[in-house]
Amino acid sequence: MNIKQLVRKNIQELQPYQSARTIGGKGDIWLNANECPTFNRLKLENIFLNRYPECQPRELLLRYSSYIGLDKKNILITRGSDEAIELLIKTFCEPQCDRIVFCPPTYDMYNVSANIMGVECLQIPLLNHSWQLDLKVIKKCINNFKLIYLCNPNNPTGSLINFRDVLALLKMTYGKSLVIIDEAYIEFSPMNSLVNLISQYSNLVVLRTLSKAFSLAGLRCGFVLANFSVIKFLLKVINPYPISTPTSSIAIQFLSNINISKMQDRVFSLILNRCWLINELKLISNCIDHIFYSASNYVLVRFRNSNKVFHELSNQGIIVRDQSKKINLKNCIRISIGTSQECLKVIHAIRKIDCLYVN
């Protein structure tokens, strides 16, 4: 039997998302997935798994509500922000009819999730090197899409969207489409969060996660923050038991005041490491073409020969993320910010590579 003939045509042609773990690599310094390199201790006690969990665990909603400064009715808990990305398309887009917009170079799951759902994607690239929205092109297409996904800070560029541009976008799309801001990395630039605009704009949706600054990438816990008119429809579509009891218990622990304080200390430490790494990279001139500004826990670097650098780093046990196939990112590599020791090893390794250009 030919199983392929039973598969939806768009799935047959689908290019799946290539996660850091899927790509893999040989080494002991993993700087390819923007994970937090350190972790808090946790306790799992008196957890009973014979009962189904709450669809939206009340205590977790209250904890996150307190952390974010938003009413719990404006919060939906999901299995990481990846589920939220897909859930919004599933809820608001008609397959083979509606469109979404995303602005590359950016996170690939916006495109992949739409393709899985049979929803057309319209790519409007960020303005080259400034990495800002091309509002003129977006305005021309304003009646042709239901959702627009923006990542802020953007992955993989590390850039921030101009606040005035976001306001202009919210106004021009009002009553026509939803503006979805993915704030997976916002704890590294908290002053740039758009959560405070949710009460003013019913077409604004903000996505959050515990995977990055909270160092819980393995937990899979994220949040949709939006007007209740959006949340109530997402509740119709989300699976009945999306958040396991252990997931909820751990997330609640990490949202305690003491663990939020530890998270903020960890973020401060990573920002110091990022500044040090960037300053050291600026002293390496032969193999590096450009170092991009970053407001996140990674830095994007354009090398003169990214393929050579990528493989040399891999040979030295350092796994980074090749971005050179993405639009406007020729010869670019994204380096996650690790511990101070890991950053030091990265610099030593790139200095060795730099010497090859001299000799």
UniProtKB/Swiss-Prot annotation:
Q: Which GO terms describe its molecular function?
A: histidinol-phosphate transaminase activity; pyridoxal phosphate binding
Q: Which GO terms describe its biological process?
A: L-histidine biosynthetic process
**Coiled-coil regions listed in the entry:** none
One Pfam family here: Aminotran_1_2
Where on the chain is N6-(pyridoxal phosphate)lysine found, per UniProt? Answer: 212
Q: Which UniProt keywords apply?
A: Amino-acid biosynthesis, Aminotransferase, Histidine biosynthesis, Pyridoxal phosphate, Transferase
**Uppermost EC category:** transferase
Give its E.C. classification number: 2.6.1.9
* Family annotation (SUPFAM superfamilies): PLP-dependent transferases
Q: Is-annotated flag, keyword Transferase?
A: yes
- Which co-factors does it depend on? pyridoxal 5'-phosphate
Which pathway does this chain act in?
Amino-acid biosynthesis; L-histidine biosynthesis; L-histidine from 5-phospho-alpha-D-ribose 1-diphosphate: step 7/9
Task: Name the reaction it catalyses.
Answer: L-histidinol phosphate + 2-oxoglutarate = 3-(imidazol-4-yl)-2-oxopropyl phosphate + L-glutamate
Give the UniProt family note: Belongs to the class-II pyridoxal-phosphate-dependent aminotransferase family. Histidinol-phosphate aminotransferase subfamily.
Q: How does it assemble?
A: Homodimer.
- This chain belongs to which protein, by name? Histidinol-phosphate aminotransferase
Instruction: Name the gene that codes for it.
Output: hisC
